[in-house]
């Protein structure tokens, strides 16, 4: 299903993505919204572009899964929400950030929770379930202004990896779950559909083999300049 040619609100996107979407946001975005997600080593958090009739989000590989989530959500704002057009202006970026915040930390959810309970295990569970950083949640609370105790604010000053390590209950997520989530956001990733199309294009001579090798993250038949991992549409010749 592709909804990237329609106006979609954060609430509608949440419904389409389904329960627990933040645990593997890249896969849900592809499966439920028809937007491809690519993960590569980048010098910046990410960006979005269009290849043929498909929207593509390119995310910088990082072990900070919460950063990947917010980047994907931010780029979805540019794609799905007209007021967050990808024009590069401060207004566009602010609108995309607002979309991401409402997608991951909806106002109704934030206001339904108690932010005076000083249990760090509960705060860690909120961070894990929403798929955000302590900083992002702190910023969201500052914006929405629900009652927040000083103790909760102090907990949210804790770096996200440390809070997860020290306070996330194993009944919510195991140590292996945390590692897998971290590995997913750091692992080079290309949609299976795109890899299949690229392989077929190479086989019939419509794309260079170096393109497929680059997408797979392996040396090509002829070593290319790997000084930049930026996604170039030229590397996907034959697909569009």
Identify the residue ranges that each predicted region occupies:
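Active-site hotspot residues in diverse enzymes, especially metal/ion-binding acidic/histidine motifs
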Residues: 1-240
């Amino acid at each position: 299903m592709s909804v990237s040619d329609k106006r979609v609100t954060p609430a509608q996107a949440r419904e389409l993505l389904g329960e627990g979407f933040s645990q593997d946001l890249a896969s849900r975005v592809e499966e439920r919204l028809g937007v491809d997600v690519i993960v590569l080593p980048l010098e910046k958090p990410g960006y979005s572009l269009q290849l043929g009739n498909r929207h593509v989000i390119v995310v910088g590989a990082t072990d900070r899964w919460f950063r990947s989530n917010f980047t994907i959500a931010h780029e979805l704002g540019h794609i799905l929400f007209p007021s967050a057009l990808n024009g590069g202006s401060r207004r566009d970026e602010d609108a995309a950030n607002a979309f991401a915040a409402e997608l991951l930390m909806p106002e109704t959810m934030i206001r339904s929770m108690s932010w005076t309970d000083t249990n760090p295990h509960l705060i860690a569970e909120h961070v894990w379930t929403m798929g955000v950083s302590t900083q992002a949640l702190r910023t969201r609370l500052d914006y929405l202004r629900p009652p927040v105790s000083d103790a909760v604010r102090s907990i949210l000053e804790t770096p996200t990896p440390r809070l997860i390590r020290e306070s996330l209950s194993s009944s919510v997520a195991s140590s292996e779950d945390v590692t897998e989530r971290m590995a997913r956001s750091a692992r080079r990733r290309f949609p299976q559909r795109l890899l299949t199309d690229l392989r077929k294009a190479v086989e019939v001579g419509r794309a260079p083999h170096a393109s497929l090798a680059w997408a797979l993250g392996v040396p090509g038949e002829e070593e290319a300049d790997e000084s930049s991992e930026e996604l170039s549409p030229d590397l996907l010749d034959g697909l569009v």
